[in-house]
Amino acid sequence: MDGTAIYAGKKTEVVAVDLLDANLASNVTRQIYGQVVGLNIYDGGAGGLQLNIGGRGLDPNRSANFNTRQNGYDISADVLGYPESYYTPPPEALSEIQVVRGAASLQYGTQFGGLVNFKFKSPNPNKKIEFISRQTVGSYDLLASFNSISGTLGKFSYYNYFNYKEGKGFRPNTSFNSRNYHGHFEYLLSDKTKIWFEATISDYLAQQPGGLTDAQFQDDPTISIRERNWFDVSWLLGNVRLEHRFSNSTEFSLNLFGLDASRSALGFRENRVLSLDPGEERELLIDNFQNWGTEARLLTRYKIGQQDAVALIGSKYYQAFNRQRQGAGPATAGPDFSFVDEEFPTFARRSTYTFPNLNLAFFGENIFNITNRLSITPGFRFEYIKTQGVGNFTRVFTDLAGNLISTDIQEEDRTNERSFLLLGIGAAYQLAKQTELYANFSENFRSITFNDIRIVNPAQIISEDLEDETGFTADLGVRGTVNDLLRFDVSGFMLYYSNRISANNQIIDEFNRVRNITDNVGTALILGIETVADINLKKILFQANNDIKLNLFLNSALTTSEYIQSDLNNAIDGQKVEHIPEVNIKTGLRFGYKNFLGSIQYSYLSEQFNDPLNSEPFSDSTAPNAGIIGTLPAYDVMDLSLSYTYKNWRLEAGINNLLDNSYFTQRATGYPGPGIIPAEPRTFYTTLQ
C-alpha cells in the first residue's frame, strides 16, 4: 500500500530516479526505464521532450496505452478521448516512477498498459531553503539547465523547479527549446490533515525534419527533406489535494485537478514520404484541450476475526471539452501557427471538430488476509462514459488548372454512451520471508479516441461499425530477494485483446483509389515471460571491501503473439501482433569505487511489425506507404554513464549509443514523419550539479 492506493497482488515496478546513473537531462528512456521489464520504446525524439513507451503489444506512441499521472493525478490530453502524453516531467525533478501493469485498470482507469505515475521530490523537511542546480552540455548543441528550490517553514513547505532545454539534433531541420515550471506548496492544517496545491507550466517548440523511406535510411539516415515542419506544445496543469487521517486505520484523499493545453502541428505532410515540398501553403492542425476532474479515495484497515483486512473505495468525475481545427497555414518557413484559409481556398485538408467527454467511475478493492501468508484482493470498477465527436471535413474539388470548382462538407456527429463493470482479482502468497508468489487477473477497456473517429485526410475512411476495444490481462509470478545477493521478479503474462483498432488498413474504393480505413481488425492473444534480476556481485567477489559496488542486472521479455480472429475477411488470421519484438533484452553492469559510480547497459530488440498484415518494407520508394508500413529491423544499442561526487558537487558524463549503431524504432504515420524516424547516433553529455 502507498497512502490511499493498494498494490497487493499486482505486477509493480518502481524506478528510484536518485539512484540512476543515466542521461537525465535528455530523458533517455531506455536508460531511465532500463529495469522496467518488456518496454518497447521510440528512440527518435531529440531532447526527450515526449515519453514514448509501450509493452506487451501496445503502441509506444506518446505512451497512449498507459494512464499517465504525476503525484496521482492525470496529465494526458484527455484520459479517454486523446490519452497521449505531450508533456513529461523532467527526470531531475522526480524521486521515483511507479509502473503498475494492466491490473491497474481497476484503480486508475481502464487502459491495457496500466499506470505510469511520476512522483516528484518532496520538500526538504530539514532546511528552510535548499537550492540545487544542474547544468548540462552535450552533442549537437545540447544545453540544459535544471534549478530547484525547496524547504520547510513551520507548517508550510514547498518544492519548485524551472527547467530549460535547447538543442539542434543530429539531422538538418531539427531544433528544439523547452521550458518547464512546477510549483508544489503544502500546508499542514493539523497533525491529521494537510493540503497542497500544485501548478505545472510546460511549453516547447520543435522543428521536425520529417521521415524517410527505407532506401533513404540505408543511403544516409542523417538527411532531411522537410524544412518547414514545426510542432508546438503548451501545457498548464493544476491540482489541489487534501489528505486527512480519520484514525490510525482510516485515511482519505481528494484530488481536484484541471488541464488547459494545446498542441499545434505545422508543415508539409503528404502521404508519400518522397513528395517534395513545393514551398506553398502548409497544413496546420491545432488541438485545444480543456478538462477537469476530481477523484476521492478512502482506505481503511479492519479485522475479520484475527486477520487484518484493508478496504479501498473511490470515485472519479471527469469532464472534457476539446476542439480541433485543420486548415491552411502560412506559405512561409518559420513557426507561424496562424490559419490562412481565406488566402488558400483550394487547400484540400480542412476540418473542424469538437469532442465533449464525460466520465463517471466508482471503484473498490479489498485485501483479505486468509492466513498469515496468503492474501486475496478482489476489486471492481464501474464506468459510465459518454464520448462525442461533432464536426466536419471539407472536400475540395478543382479543375486541372487548380481553380476551385466546388466544396463538399462531410458532417460528422457521433455520440457513444455506455456503462460497464470491470472485475479483477489478485493474490499473494509468502513463500519465504523475502519471497512472494503473486497472481492477478483484470478486465481492460480502451475507448475509441478522437484520432479514431476524425477525418484529417481525403484518403482516410472511418468505419461506421468502429467499436471500443476490450479484453483482459493476467499475470503469474514470483519475486523477492535472496540474502542481499539477488533481487528478482520472474513472471508470465497473458493479454487478450478484442476489437483491436488499426489505421494501417488499405482498401480499394469504388474509384479504384487506395485508401486507409480505421477499423477493428480482430482479436489478439499475447503471451510472454518477463524476467528482472539484479545480482550483487560485490557480495560474491569483494565482500570485505565496502568501497566497491558491483551489480549485474538482466531485464528480458520473451513474447509470442497471434491474431486468433480476424474482422477483415480473415486477412490477419494467424499473423503476429504489431509492436511486439519476440526478444527484448536490456542487461548491464552498475559499478563504483567510493564516490565514483558508473553503469554500462546493452539493449537488444528483435524484429517487429507495425501493421496487422505483417507487411514487408516497400522496395519501391515511390509507393504510397513506402517508409510508413513495414517491419522494424532488429537493433542493439549500448550506453555508458559515469558520475563522481565530491562534497556538495557532482559531475556526470556519458556516451549514448556507444557503438554508434544506425537503427530506427518508429515508422510514423503522421507527425513527426511520416516515414522512418532515425534514432540518434553516438552522442556525449556532461552534467555539473
Task: Locate each region found by the language model.
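Extracytoplasmic beta-strand/coil segments of soluble accessory domains associated
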Residues: R30-A77, S95
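C-terminal beta-signal and adjacent terminal beta-strands/loops
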Residues: F493, K538, K549-L550, Y604-S619, ...
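Gram-negative outer-membrane beta-barrel transporters
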Residues: R297-L299, N372, R487-S498, R513-N614, ...
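Short strand-turn segments of transmembrane beta-barrel domains in outer membranes
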Residues: A103-S105, L115-G151, N160-F162, G169-R171, ...
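Transmembrane beta-barrel wall of Gram-negative outer-membrane proteins
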Residues: V137-E166, R171-Q208, W230-N248, Y317, ...
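Face-selective signature of the C-terminal outer-membrane beta-barrel domain
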Residues: D191-T200, S234-F397, Q430, D489, ...
